[in-house]
Amino acid sequence: MPNKVHVKKGDTVVVISGKYKGKQGKVLTVLPKDKKVVVEGVNIVKKHVRPNPKMPQGGIITQEAPIWACKVMLVCPKCNKPTRIGHRFIQEGEEEKKVRTCKKCGEIID
Protein backbone atom coordinates (compact mmCIF):
# COMPACT_ATOMS: atom_id res chain seq x y z
CA MET A 1 0.00 0.00 0.00
CA PRO A 2 1.45 3.40 -0.93
CA ASN A 3 2.49 5.80 1.80
CA LYS A 4 0.38 8.79 0.78
CA VAL A 5 -0.92 11.62 2.90
CA HIS A 6 -3.69 13.96 1.71
CA VAL A 7 -1.99 17.15 2.97
CA LYS A 8 1.32 18.80 2.10
CA LYS A 9 3.81 20.92 4.01
CA GLY A 10 2.52 24.50 4.28
CA ASP A 11 -1.20 23.61 4.05
CA THR A 12 -3.61 25.08 6.59
CA VAL A 13 -5.53 22.30 8.33
CA VAL A 14 -8.11 21.91 11.10
CA VAL A 15 -8.05 19.05 13.62
CA ILE A 16 -11.33 17.11 13.39
CA SER A 17 -11.07 14.78 16.40
CA GLY A 18 -9.29 14.30 19.69
CA LYS A 19 -7.97 16.65 22.35
CA TYR A 20 -7.24 19.48 19.88
CA LYS A 21 -10.53 19.24 17.94
CA GLY A 22 -11.36 22.49 16.11
CA LYS A 23 -7.84 23.93 16.33
CA GLN A 24 -6.37 25.34 13.10
CA GLY A 25 -2.71 25.36 12.17
CA LYS A 26 -0.13 25.11 9.43
CA VAL A 27 1.45 21.76 8.50
CA LEU A 28 5.15 21.94 9.46
CA THR A 29 6.22 18.39 8.54
CA VAL A 30 4.65 15.40 6.79
CA LEU A 31 5.77 11.88 7.76
CA PRO A 32 4.28 9.66 5.00
CA LYS A 33 5.81 6.38 6.23
CA ASP A 34 4.12 6.83 9.63
CA LYS A 35 1.00 8.48 8.10
CA LYS A 36 1.46 11.39 10.52
CA VAL A 37 1.77 15.18 10.30
CA VAL A 38 3.20 17.87 12.57
CA VAL A 39 0.82 20.83 12.90
CA GLU A 40 1.81 24.23 14.30
CA GLY A 41 0.42 24.76 17.81
CA VAL A 42 -1.10 21.27 18.09
CA ASN A 43 0.03 18.39 20.35
CA ILE A 44 2.66 20.39 22.26
CA VAL A 45 4.92 18.15 24.35
CA LYS A 46 7.80 18.80 26.74
CA LYS A 47 11.06 17.08 25.91
CA HIS A 48 14.07 16.69 28.20
CA VAL A 49 17.32 17.52 26.37
CA ARG A 50 20.76 16.51 27.54
CA PRO A 51 23.54 19.10 27.34
CA ASN A 52 25.02 19.21 23.83
CA PRO A 53 26.96 21.69 21.67
CA LYS A 54 23.70 23.29 20.52
CA MET A 55 22.27 23.60 24.06
CA PRO A 56 25.21 23.57 26.51
CA GLN A 57 22.99 23.75 29.60
CA GLY A 58 20.39 21.17 28.43
CA GLY A 59 16.91 21.47 29.96
CA ILE A 60 13.27 21.04 29.03
CA ILE A 61 12.01 22.28 25.65
CA THR A 62 8.48 22.38 24.25
CA GLN A 63 7.80 21.28 20.70
CA GLU A 64 5.03 19.96 18.44
CA ALA A 65 4.67 16.19 18.21
CA PRO A 66 3.16 14.33 15.23
CA ILE A 67 -0.54 13.42 15.05
CA TRP A 68 -2.30 10.99 12.71
CA ALA A 69 -2.99 12.48 9.27
CA CYS A 70 -6.55 11.08 9.32
CA LYS A 71 -7.35 13.45 12.21
CA VAL A 72 -6.78 16.61 10.14
CA MET A 73 -8.79 18.11 7.29
CA LEU A 74 -7.54 20.64 4.76
CA VAL A 75 -8.95 24.19 4.95
CA CYS A 76 -9.79 25.61 1.51
CA PRO A 77 -7.98 28.95 0.95
CA LYS A 78 -10.96 30.38 -1.00
CA CYS A 79 -14.05 29.35 1.00
CA ASN A 80 -12.09 29.06 4.30
CA LYS A 81 -13.93 25.86 5.31
CA PRO A 82 -12.63 22.37 6.12
CA THR A 83 -13.02 20.28 2.99
CA ARG A 84 -12.23 16.96 1.42
CA ILE A 85 -9.83 16.94 -1.50
CA GLY A 86 -10.70 16.05 -5.08
CA HIS A 87 -8.32 15.69 -8.00
CA ARG A 88 -8.62 17.09 -11.50
CA PHE A 89 -6.38 17.19 -14.55
CA ILE A 90 -5.70 20.56 -16.19
CA GLN A 91 -3.99 21.18 -19.51
CA GLU A 92 -0.60 22.88 -19.18
CA GLY A 93 0.96 23.27 -22.60
CA GLU A 94 1.09 19.81 -24.15
CA GLU A 95 0.96 17.87 -20.89
CA GLU A 96 -1.74 17.32 -18.29
CA LYS A 97 -1.12 18.23 -14.66
CA LYS A 98 -2.95 16.67 -11.69
CA VAL A 99 -4.16 19.32 -9.22
CA ARG A 100 -5.99 19.20 -5.89
CA THR A 101 -9.45 20.77 -5.77
CA CYS A 102 -11.90 21.75 -3.03
CA LYS A 103 -14.94 19.43 -2.92
CA LYS A 104 -17.16 22.28 -1.60
CA CYS A 105 -16.42 25.18 -3.97
CA GLY A 106 -14.51 23.42 -6.78
CA GLU A 107 -11.56 25.84 -6.55
CA ILE A 108 -8.04 24.63 -7.39
CA ILE A 109 -5.99 24.42 -4.18
CA ASP A 110 -2.47 24.21 -5.60
UniProtKB/Swiss-Prot annotation:
Cysteine disulfide partners in this protein: none
PROSITE patterns the UniProt entry points to: RIBOSOMAL_L24
GO terms for MF: rRNA binding; structural constituent of ribosome
Pfam families linked to this entry: KOW, ribosomal_L24
Signal peptide limits: none
GO CC term, one of those recorded: ribonucleoprotein complex
Protein name: Large ribosomal subunit protein uL24
Organism: Caldicellulosiruptor saccharolyticus (strain ATCC 43494 / DSM 8903 / Tp8T 6331)
